[in-house]
Amino acid sequence: MGPTKYIIIAVVIIIICVILGLYVVDKKAKEKLSEASKEARRLKEEAERDAEAKKKEAILEAKEESHKLRAEVERENRERRNEVQRLERRIIQKEEALDKKSEALENKEEALNKKQQKIEDVETHMEELHEKQRTELERISGLTTEQAKEFLLEQVRKEVKHETAVMIKEIETKAKEEADKRAREVITYAIQRCAADHVAETTVHVVNLPNDEMKGRIIGREGRNIRTLETLTGVDLIIDDTPEAVILSGFDPIRREVARIALEKLIVDGRIHPARIEEMVEKAKKEVEVSIKEEGEQATFETGIHGLHIELIRLLGRLKYRTSYGQNVLKHSIEVSHLAGLMASELGIDPTLAKRVGLLHDIGKAVDHEVEGPHAIIGSEIAKKYRESALVVNAIGAHHGDMEPQSLEAILVQAADAISAARPGARRETLEAYIKRLEKLEEIANECEGVEKSYAIQAGREIRIMVKPEVLDDTGCIEMARNIVKQIESELEYPGQIKVNVIRETRAIEYAK
């Protein structure tokens, strides 16, 4: 057989195989389609059965829910009907109670009307009786009603006026006694708790020398050294027969301190000539400035005062080198601060403000030789300049009466200032001036007409005058006290204040037999 024939046979076989394959595939596809149709019908039937079951179940649930809702609505309706019935019963009860009250009110109103009528009848009867009595009284006394009223009112007015005057006097006396007692207690406690160790200072200072030959070196050739030192410091150097000592005299303690430091440095150095003196004086001034600041800071530390301006601290330090009647002003200010704080504590007041004012009250004395005006006013202006509070400014200006005090602390500082100044040994006068002042006080008092005797007491701070009662009455005593005060103020010079006490005593003696 040729090749072509084989090829044809192969092709025929392939075609037959393809046809058989297609037939087999088609048959299997028809079988699968038939099975799928059967499965679909089965699933559809199951779904229909499930849907029918769920439908029935939903219908049952809906019926149950409907039954529950109907039962709930019926229950609520029953409760509402019960509530309405209860409210109706309450309303009926209230209506019945209101009816009873209304009936009772009507009965009371009727009873009140009857009583009102009786009262009106009684008032009418009383008016008739009153008119009869008034007419009868006018006939018997011979006075009209207005005259009788005026007479009675005048009698009552006199009695009330007298009783009021007696009561006022008793109250004033009791209040004064209580106030004096409390004031004495406060001042006594404050003085007991304040221990001051500083008394009067002098206006001279003694510088010790290693030998008397040093006096000649201090004087210098033709006195040039002593003149230079006196010119630069403004202090008098007194060189006398006192062995190994030179006296520095001056009323400005700062200058005196500068001179002391400079002179002591010159003595230690040994080189004493005008150029060296000038150098030492400059160093001494710087040392004093440093000392002034340290003293001011120490004063604030001792009193517990904080927040002061640095310039106020410096002015406080300068007060160490100021004296008033021999009393060191810085020590006096510290003492016043403590006293004011203690008195404030005794009175139940915060002592901080009182202590602050007490420390600063004499700050004006640090510059009063540079600025014109009373030191209290100067001090208040300085405090205002350095942003102290209005109460502090007022209290400083008022501590000598130059301003009207606006706080209790200002009054306390006035009292503390007087206590510190009046303390024995705080301020010094010469014995001769002291005796002359006492004699002059008694002389002024004895010159007045009607004076029986007078005594200067309390170290010259009080003059007690006994007058003749037959010559002077109470008004005359008041006038005499004022006149004596004016005469003392015009003729005498004295520290602090002087109390003028005029006493008029009348005695009446009778004997019972």
From Swiss-Prot:
The keyword Cell membrane applies. It holds the Pfam family RNase_Y_N. Keywords: Cell membrane, Endonuclease, Hydrolase, Membrane, Nuclease, RNA-binding, Transmembrane, Transmembrane helix. It is found in: Cell membrane. Residues 329-422 form the HD domain. GO terms for molecular function: RNA binding; RNA endonuclease activity. The chain crosses the membrane at residues 6-26. Its EC number is 3.1.-.-. Endoribonuclease that initiates mRNA decay. This is Ribonuclease Y. One of its GO terms (cellular component) is plasma membrane. It comes from Clostridium botulinum (strain Okra / Type B1). One of its GO terms (biological process) is mRNA catabolic process. It is a single-pass membrane protein. It comes from the Bacteria. Residues 35-59 are annotated as: Disordered. Belongs to the RNase Y family. Residues 203-288 form the KH domain.
